[in-house]
Every structure is written in C-alpha cells, then in structure tokens.
Amino acid sequence: MQITKDKLNIAVIGGGGREHAIIRRLAQSRRAGKIYALPGNGGISREHAGSDSCPVTCTGIAATDLEKIVDFVLNNEIDFAAVIPDDPLVMGLCDMLREKGIPCFGPSKAAAIIEGSKAFSKELMQKYGIPTAEYKVFSDADAAAEYAAHHSLPVVVKADGLALGKGVIIAKTHEEAIEAVNDMMRGGKFGRSGATVVVEEFLTGPEVSVLAFTDGKTVVPLPSSMDHKRAGDGDTGLNTGGMGVIAPNPFYTKAAEEQVMQSIILPTLNAMNAEGRTFRGCLYFGLMLTPNGPRVIEYNCRFGDPETQAVLPLVEGDLLEIMIATQAGTLDKCEIKLSDKSSCCLVLASGGYPEKYEKGKLITFDGDVEADCGVCIFHAGTKLGTPDSSEFVTSGGRVLGITAVRDTLEEAVRAAYAAAERVHFDGKYSRSDIGLSALRESRLKNG
C-alpha cells in the first residue's frame, strides 16, 4: 500500500521495552504526527509528555484483543500501524488491518508461521537445505517420550507453538527429557502450543542474534547481537525473555556474516517466497556458530526483546520511512546506515523472575539518569503509580532496560552498569556478567 500523506498518525501494537525503543525512534521521524501505543506502559505514557510535535498516548488495549485494536485504528484516524509482538502477528492482525485498508508493518499470518510453528520452520529448513539441528516432530506423547529416552545427551525438547520464550528445555538426562515431553504434551504446560513437540540434537558454539528488515525482495541485516537468556550469572538458572544484550557480537566475524547471508538468510527468504508465504517485516535469526558452521536455532517473525533495545540505537535513518518501505516493497530505495559503535542493554528485573515475583514496587532514580549517564532507559514492566502520577511502579518481571552506546563494547558495558546503580526498587535484580564472554572474545581478536 502506498502512503502519500505527509504527517501520519501511527498505532504501535505492544507494551514492552522493545516497543518503547521503537516508539522513541518513530517519534523522531519528521512524518510522525500522533503515536498511540496498544497497550503501552508507564514509560511509554510519559514519552514526549506535553509535546506538541509528536504526542504519545497509551490506550490500555491488550495486544491480543484484535477486534478492539481494529476498531480503535478505524475510529482514530490511524494512517499506519506497526504490529510488534509475536502473538498478534501469528494470530493475523496485520491481515485484518490490511483488509480494512490500513498500511501495516509486520508479516502476514501465513508468513508469521515461521515463528508460530517450530515444526513448520524445521520442515522448511529441511526442504530447502537450510542448516539446522537434526530433529524429529511428534504429535504423539508416547512416541516422543520413547524417542527422547534413547536420544544422545543433552537433548532439546521444544514446544511447537508460542510459549513466551520458555518453551525450550535442554535436558541433561533422559529422565528430564521424558519429563519435558510429558509436561508439554500430557500436562498442558503450554496449552495448545505444546500439543506437538520438536525433539532435536543439542548444538554447541557461540549464539548470535541477527535482525533483518525485508520486503520479501531486499534484505537489510542489522548489527549482530548476543542475548543472555538465563536468569543467573554464568548462564545458570532458568530461561528468561532475556537479561541483557550486547551489539555487535564479536563472535560474528565477517566470514561468518557472509556465510550466514548465503546459506541461511537469502535461502530462508527464497523458501518463504517459494511457499507463497512472502515475509515482509523484521525477521529474527537465532543462530549458533557450531564447529561445522552456522546453524539456525530459531526464527522469530518480529523484533527481538531485548535485542531491539541494543540494536536499534546502532541503526541510522528514519525508522518510520524504513517501516513504510518494508510494507510497500520499496526497501531497496531506503537509506539505512549502520553505526560502527557498540551498545549494551542491561535488564533490571524483579526479584524472583522468571518465577514468582512481586509487583507494585516504587521505582526511584538518582537524578536524570538518562542525561547524566548518557544512556537510554526503556520501560518494560512499569506502570504509573496513579494515572496523574509522575512516579513509576513495577508491573512485570523485566522492569527496565538500560542501553548505553559507546565507541567500544567495554565502555558501553561499563556505562550501562554505572547507570543501573542509580535506579532503585525493592527486589531489583540484574546479572553481573552481561557482555563478559563477548569482551573476552573481543580482547582476543584485538590482541
């Protein structure tokens, strides 16, 4: 869909730290009129507060309430929508909006299946020769348990559908593997998402995340990154949505980058085109650099979180124009430059996350942390203490992300941690080793 209007009212679907980072960039576009977040969060509600140039309003409408979202968009003179989270994408929100004549950034339901079903993505990779782990798909619990019980260890058990980033179990014993299968397929741990499982080999090597804009023809990979998914230092503890990210990833060499482009990124886009599922939006490649070459661990049909908070500040250009070009099929005409700086996003979480944690804890800041420390603070699990309040309280497991951009990775990591010392709430928790393995690799590369 072509957009000729100069000033655009924009709806951004989502309410986490990733959406805060995206909204902050969209608000900088000369074409941004009003921005509405559905639902938004406490920090987003104070973005550009009192500004006439680009007011930002949070609606409180849940990102999965598709009918309400469509009604809001149609009744509030919205010119462009950006659907960010996985659930509404997999549920087909972009299709619903486009059917109503609303230009929309994000893949169709047919394309979002690349994340919505791990069985689909594994079979796509097998069919088109895209390197990934050896695997089998099961819809029968007995067969899955039998296969897992005799698989070499460790073995990976994955729920087929969306599971908030927690649907992957790395089993070190056969008992753990069988338990994972039973929890998903018999115990309903992830509902319908676990009715089918993928059992696959365990791969070793550095992990790399690569986000890429694509309109189905042109692809623009963004700076690589390294997520830290485990809750505890030294990659211990439970899987989380992500406790911190550094970018670029020093393990992702120029040679690896070229190999991934030729053996993974381009073949994936070509495969989706061949299947009649052309992907337009932001495609996330979760990779492992194994001794036998790069392998795909997972695809996501959207911006990663917290990868976006670290990567987006390294992307130069008008994000709104990039999004418009992506949905219009004109990405080849869009100017996108990538910074040569480094970034670190440190996540501050509620104590007990990702399991049981308390909410409603007052968040305080020692002065203007963003201005004083030269960082960006992106709100994830926050809300206003009262509707008219300027105080924030915690409302989720991952509360804030602090992003520092500096000339070197070491400086970025140090700056993010220094800023975090000036943010306070009861039970505040963060890992103390974000970027540590990357710094070691960087020092080895640079002597």
Set out the residue ranges of the language-model regions.
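ATP-binding N-terminal substructure of ATP-dependent carboxylate-amine bond-forming enzymes
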Residues: M1-K109
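Solvent-exposed alpha-helices and their adjacent loops that cap or buttress functional pockets
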Residues: Q2-K5, Q28-R30, S45-R46, N75, ...
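Short acidic-hydrophobic, aromatic-tinged amphipathic segments that line or gate anion-handling sites
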Residues: T57-T64, K136-D140, A171
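A conserved helix-loop-beta module that forms one wall/lid of the active-site cleft
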Residues: F105-G167
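Internal nucleotide-binding/catalytic subdomain
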Residues: G167-T308
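Active-site "cap" helix and flanking loop/linker of ATP-utilizing ligase/carboxylase catalytic domains
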Residues: V260-L283, N300-D372, A380, P387
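Generic C-terminus detector
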Residues: V393-G447
